[in-house]
A protein has these predicted regions:
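Glycine- and small/polar-enriched repetitive beta-structure motifs of secreted/surface proteins
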Residues: 4, 10, 20-24, 28-42, ...
């Protein structure tokens, strides 16, 4: 009678031994069907694990506080009667409102009603596209305008007001300093109580100022005053320069 055998390495005896041909090195043999089932099960486990690792996109909203409300996904309202009415908006604080897309309102009664507008501070207000108001009662109502400081105001397009009660009320106007005021187009006023009323005028210093008709004029120094009167068909006729404390340049072309 023929015997079918083979030689394998024994892990127990640490030598080669003669065994039946159906024996294996690592233990009992498995059929092809069993091996395929094991491989298929491993593949399913791999897919399940991969699914767990893939991030999921979830739209969510959150509101907390008496009477707070959110009307769209991806918005947050926190505080009594805080309200958001568009996607990607944030309202934090009592009676805050963020009512246009990407708007942010933070602080008691803060309101951000322009697209991409931000209002931070009690009673702060930001109403125009991409406007920014920072400070209690700060108001930014011009497109791309910025107001920083208590009661500061930036009402002109791309205007900037920095300081308590600073006001930039024309296009591209810049007012820097407590109670500084700029009403001239493209004008700059820097210093406490500085006032730039003329178009494209620059005033620097406490109480320095330019007249409304003194276009293209400069006043530098405490109390410096740039006047002048623009003539028809002469864009530079009113240009005056006053430099020094209480300096005055009142006639066209004065220095």
């Amino acid at each position: 009678m023929n015997h079918i055998y083979k030689v394998i390495w024994s892990r127990v005896k640490h030598c080669y031994v003669v065994v039946s041909e159906i024996a294996t090195n690592g233990g009992k043999s498995r059929t092809i069907f069993e091996k395929k089932n094991a491989s298929f099960g491993a593949l399913l486990c791999a897919f399940a694990l991969a699914g767990c690792l893939v991030p999921s996109v979830v739209e969510a909203s959150f509101n907390a506080g008496i009477g707070s409300s959110v009307f769209h996904q991806n918005s947050i309202a926190v505080g009594d009667t805080a309200k958001t009415t568009q996607e990607y908006t944030v309202a934090l604080g009592s009676r805050t409102q963020a009512t246009d897309i990407y708007a942010i309102a933070i602080g008691d009664q803060a309101k951000a009603t322009g697209q991409g507008a931000t209002a931070i501070g009690s009673l702060s207000l930001s109403t125009a596209l991409h406007s920014l108001a920072v400070g209690d009662q700060a108001h930014a109502t011009g497109q791309d305008s910025s107001a920083y400081g208590l009661k500061s105001q930036a009402t002109g397009l791309a205007s900037v007001a920095v300081g308590a009660d600073a006001k930039a009320n024309n296009e591209n106007a810049i007012a820097m300093g407590n109670t500084s005021t700029v009403t001239g187009l493209n004008a700059i006023g820097i210093g406490s109580l500085a006032n730039a009323a003329g178009t494209q005028t620059v005033v620097v210093g406490r109480q320095a100022h330019s007249d409304a008709n003194s276009e293209n004029s400069v006043a530098i120094g405490q109390g410096a005053h740039a006047g002048g009167q623009k003539r028809a068909n002469d864009p530079y006729s009113a240009s005056t320069i006053a430099i020094g404390n209480v300096a005055h340049a009142m006639e066209n072309g004065d220095i």
